[in-house]
Amino acid sequence: MNKKKLFPLALVPLAATSLQAQSNIQTGRTDKRPNIILFMVDDMGWQDTSLPFWTQKTHYNELYETPNMERLARQGMMFTQAYASSISSPTRCSLITGTNAARHRVTNWTLQKNTMTDRKNKQLAVPDWNYNGVSQVPGTNNTFVGTSFVQILKDNGYHTIHCGKAHFGSIDTPGEDPHHWGFEVNIAGHAAGGLASYLGEENYGHTKDGKPVSLMAVPGLEKYWGTETFVTEALTQEAIKALNKAKKYNQPFYLYMAFLPPA
């Protein structure tokens, strides 16, 4: 059996964090292309870790213990001049399309189709931003059309897995569905960025008969309903299952792991 290493990367830009984790995955492949795991951590500042992203540790670095991030940095690379938008959708739209918010013009969080999420202000005019998010195909108003790097990976032989928070496009637009972006497997990804409940006891925001209590109800985790399983644990278990299945394929894999709760 050949051991295949995941390329390590540590990236903490302001409010969002992406990590490309290192691990040894045993596969039967002779393909030398790397397996990739990319973590997107929600609402995490550049000082919200014991790993300093400045020339020296700050007071806030001392408040945290994140040994795994320190290990990733030692074994990989750190990028200290990166940028992320201050809220969810713009950052995730940038990641999936490779464009910044000034170009894709998704400048606030998205949810319902053709609905701005800006707070009303009598003193300010609301800009005509792309409140329907991003898409790979034209045809939806107020939507940026771009190419997904996940689609490129898939087209070049990668098995692609999405797990967790998507938040790329509004409800009933092509961009809301991770499959649209080239993911072959989608675990819990949909249009909403928040979640109705973190708890399996509350069916992650569904009633006992399976009806969502709000647009924030987390889909696809029915097997954990009624159990004492926090949503992070449920997503982790599903990601591990998807990776174990992917190891059986004669192709490299890409896992996008986007946990729902803030870090």
Predicted regions and their residues:
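Catalytic metal-binding/acid-base residues of hydrolase active sites
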Residues: 44-45, 100-101, 166-167, 260
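Generic enzyme active-site microenvironment
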Residues: 40, 163
